[in-house]
Amino acid sequence: MAHENVWYSHPRKFGKGSRQCRISGSHSGLIRKYGLNIDRQSFREKANDIGFYKYR
């Protein structure tokens, strides 16, 4: 079995490896609440466009 066939052959059905940010594709710092699936950095950039506002 060559290396090309083995690389990323393990199924990613659950866990952190199965989910990624819908904007940047990152796996770290994901916000899954309300079905957002956006990482922290992208959320801070796009929060106002989505409809999240700070009341301070």
UniProtKB/Swiss-Prot annotation:
Pfam families: Ribosomal_S14 (PF00253). GO terms for cellular component: cytosolic small ribosomal subunit. It comes from the Eukaryota. One of its GO terms (molecular function) is zinc ion binding. One of its GO terms (biological process) is cytoplasmic translation. InterPro entries: Ribosomal_uS14, RIbosomal_uS14_euk_arc, Ribosomal_uS14_sf. Keywords: Ribonucleoprotein, Ribosomal protein. This is Small ribosomal subunit protein uS14. It comes from Kluyveromyces lactis (strain ATCC 8585 / CBS 2359 / DSM 70799 / NBRC 1267 / NRRL Y-1140 / WM37) (Yeast).
